[in-house]
Amino acid sequence: MTSDSVSNLKPAPIPTEEEELPNSAASLLPFDTESSSLISSSSKQSTNRVLFICLILFTAMALSAAFAFAFLFFSSVPASASASSSSSSSSSTSHSVDEVSRPLTKLKHPVVILVSSDGFRFGYQFKTHTPNINRLIQNGTEADLGLIPVFPTLTFPNHYSIVTGLYPAYHGIIDNHFVDPVTGLTFTMASHDPHWWLGEPLWETVTNHGLKASTYFWPGSEVKKGSWNCPKDYCMYYNGSVPFEERVDTVLSYFDLPNSEIPVFMTLYFEDPDHQGHKVGPDDPQITEAVAGIDKMIGRLIHGLESKGVFEDVNIIMVGDHGMVGTCDKKLIFLDDLAQWIEIPKEWVQSYSPVLAIRPPSDSQPKDIVAKISEGLKSGKVDNGQYLRVYLKEELPIRLHYSDSDRIPPIVGLIEEGFKVEQKRSKRQECGGSHGYDNAFFSMRTIFIAHGPAFARGRKVPSFENVQIYNTVTAILNITGAPNNGTASFAQSILLPSH
C-alpha cells in the first residue's frame, strides 16, 4: 500500500454505547406496583420459590462459564507462547544453515566452476529425467523463471556478457559476425585479436589479483590481453571434436593440484543442446536426448568432485547463453518484396536474421531508408511484413542497450520470434530452430542454477539479466571487479552472507 493510500484512510468512528438489553431472568421478577398486592401470599411464595431456583441455576451457569473462560485463557497463553517459541526455533533451525555461507572443509579458498550449456532453453530441464541437474536445483539456488540473456540473444555476445558484466555495445561483441566500420575488418567466431574484445573478462580479473584461472572453450578465453595470456594447460583452444567427458575430466584434474595451485575460477563449455536445436527446433526428441547427455556430464562433474572430497566446497554455476524457438519456411520476410518502396542490395545487409542489420552507404540518409522500409512493411503488400519492425539504432527500445557502439549498424530490424528475413525467394525448404530475437521473448530465456557454500539450498530467485553474474562471481571470490553494467548490490541479493 502506498503512503498516499495510507494517508487517505479515515479512522473508524467511535461506536456509541448501546443500551443493555434486559436480562432474560428479569422477566421472572414481579413488578413493584400496587397491583402486586393483589397477588395472594401463596402465589407469592410459589413465585419466590421459582425465582430462587432460577437465580441459583443462573449463578451456577455464570460461575461455570467464568471458570471455563479462565481455564481456556490461562492455559492457552503458555501453549501459544510455546507454539510461537517452537515455531521461531523451528524457523531458525530450518534457515540456520542458509543464514551464512557454509565454511570450506578441504579447500583453502573459494572456487567457482562456471558451466555453459549452449542453447539450453529454460524448460528443457523438464523435458526428461535430469537427476543431476535436479540435485543442483534442490540443494542450490535457481532463477525461478530462467536467466534473461542480453540482446541480441546470440552465442558470442551473451557468453562475453556473462564473463564481463557488460552489454554487447560496451564489450564490443555485438554479433557472432560483423564488420568494424572504422577498420573495415570482419569479426568472426575465430577472431582472437584483442582489439575486438573490450572490457575485462573474469579470467583476466582473477589473474589481476594474482590468482589462477582456467578456461575450457569459453568464447573469448583464447584472446591474450591484459594479464591473461591463455596459459598452457589452463586455457584450451576451441576444438569441437573434444568429447564432453574429456572436458569434464580436465576440470576435475585441477583438484589434484596442491591447494595453492587450484584455479579459483574455471569455465566449462558444451555445444549441446544448441547444436540439435538449430537442426530440429526445441520440441524434437533429439533435444530430449541432448539434455539427458548434458545431465550426464553434470553428474560426471558432481561425482568427480565428490570423489575428491570437494563437492560441498565448490560453487558450481550452470547457465545457458540463450533459448531457442522453432522456425519454418512459412515464416519468411523477403527484402526484395520491398522493391516498390526501396531497393536494399545485399551489400548493405550485415545480418538478416534474427536481427536485421543494415549499413547503407555513408552518403545515404538512414532515416529516409527506415521510413521507406516501414511504409512498405505496413502496406499489407509484403508477405509477413507486420512481423518486422525497423529502427534507427538510437531509437531502439532503451531496455535493449543496443545503440552505443559504432560497430552496431545504423539500421536495426526487430523480428517476431520464429520469423526470418531473407534477401529473395528460393526453393530451399527448411524447418529448424533459431535464437537471437528480442530478449523479452520467454523462448529466449535460459537457465541459472547455482550450488555451493555461497548459495542457499532450495532457493528460488526472480529472473535477472546475465550481466549480473560477473559481480556475483567476484563477490564469491572476494576480489574487486572491473566497472560493468551489473548492479553492485545484486550479489548481496543472491548470495549467502559471508561469515
Language-model features: where?
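Acidic/histidine-rich catalytic neighborhood
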Residues: 313, 322-367
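Short, structured active-site-proximal loop/turn typified by the sulfatase FGly-forming signature C/S-X-P-X-R
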Residues: 122-170
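Structural recognition of the beta-strand scaffold that forms the well-ordered cores
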Residues: 112-116, 123, 143-146, 161-163, ...
